[in-house]
From Swiss-Prot:
It is an enzyme of class 3 (hydrolase). One of its GO terms (molecular function) is succinylglutamate desuccinylase activity. This is Succinylglutamate desuccinylase. It catalyses: N-succinyl-L-glutamate + H2O = L-glutamate + succinate. Belongs to the AspA/AstE family. Succinylglutamate desuccinylase subfamily. Transforms N(2)-succinylglutamate into succinate and glutamate. InterPro entries: AspA/AstE_fam (IPR050178), AstE_AspA_cat (IPR055438), Aste_AspA_hybrid_dom (IPR007036), SuccinylGlu_desuccinylase (IPR016681). The keyword Translocase does not apply. The active site is at 215.
Amino acid sequence: MLALGKLLELTLTDHEPAEKTQVTPKGARLRWLGEGALEVRPAESDDCGLDLLLSAGIHGNETAPIELLERLLHGVANGKIRPRARVLFLFGNPAAIRKGERFIEQDINRLFNGRHELSSGFEALRAAELEQFARVFFSKPGRNRLHYDLHTAIRGSKIEQFALYPYKEGRKHSRRELARLAAAGMEAVLLQSKSSITFSAFTYEQLEAEAFTLELGKARPFGQNEQVNLDKLEERLIRIIEATEPEDESSLDGLQLFSVSREIIKHSDSFHLHLPADIENFSELSKGYLLAEDLAEMRWVVEEEGARIIFPNPKVKNGLRAGILIVPDSGQRLG
């Protein structure tokens, strides 16, 4: 095994490799770019024209996606996977990964799209660094660009594996990409309708990549992810890396689509979310339900048919999103 194929080990030990570039048995070049960052470049004759960014560990306690990327990188390094795409592997928050914690000072996935410039501390610096890694990686003209940011969730979910598809004005969500997600085992996709400050939103809005946040199950410690089944996703990622996907894939069978109806914003310390602490993502809420209250008699009452809640979190900082109210989407606006 090439030393650079052990990116997780290098990250966990906070070790900088002496050898920054190595070549795999299949002729692919591995290049260490910095802490938690490794580029895989296929042999020139193998290059299919795709630039694929795979990120995990934006939250340090979300280990199943980190282990998945490590398996893929091992496959490339030992020659079992022959890459035809350029791939950038990123472990988002190395310090938090080493501690097994969600973050050190603040949620790094709320610091992209320039938000880090309004903040300070370790995570703000790392968000800026991750943006730069992505910006350089996606700077080559005339290539297809794809970014999967892999996560697991704090809480359980009625729909265990789902994706969030960022928004940019004037740009349509791609049916082809949704079919790819369905083939990768995603059960649902949330089609977002406003700009965001997550990593995938940055690469989608600023770098013209097709980009997604993938939620893959419940967050657990390293070595305890037997219940998180990523077989379909792993198989699909290998196909993407090796450029062996079916060319005419278009089926969305079994894929549920949702759109954002409203975001619940916490404005003050008086904010109260009227939901059980253990409520699962995608739980249905009945029409007329009092969802949340805040200062100045501010109230959020469910008005939508078929409404569901995802990412409820009353402990966020004031001014941030404390939950998202979503509704089924017909998919009529897909490109």
